[in-house]
Amino acid sequence: MGHNGGVANHAGVAGAAAAAGLKSAAGLGVVGVSLSGLYAITGIGIPCPWRLLTGTLCPFCGATNMGAALLRGDLDAAWAANPFVLTALSGLTLACIFWVVELLGGTAVRLPRRLSDQRIWYIALAAAGIAFALWRNLLPAA
């Protein structure tokens, strides 16, 4: 096909990427809400293998408490439980909003080309997680 076929095909690929992102986020959301709800009801959480082995908190320790606090609508308690995961969740929520707008026919929001490589985001997220783990384990509680 001509130019229009390429544009339509590109739009279909972009829409497929948005749908795939939403599908992944929905799966993560179902698991997170389920585990947080179970913890809120029963008090039974997930033991952290890292904490069991080292006695230190991993970047995700407190995420179940954070989720339970969000289910109660207590943003302060959610932040106190795990600000790293809460911040990452906020970013994921923003991405989901953009994907829904795109799937409903709105403008697709894209990062600048220099920031579009997923490896950059994986490295940045890992570095932030390590920095957060060091901060929460090495600095005295205020």
What residue spans do the PLM features occupy?
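Juxtamembrane/interfacial segments flanking transmembrane helices
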Residues: I44-W50, L103-R110, A142
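Alpha-helical transmembrane segments and their immediate interhelical/interface regions
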Residues: M1-G15, L92-V100, L134, A141
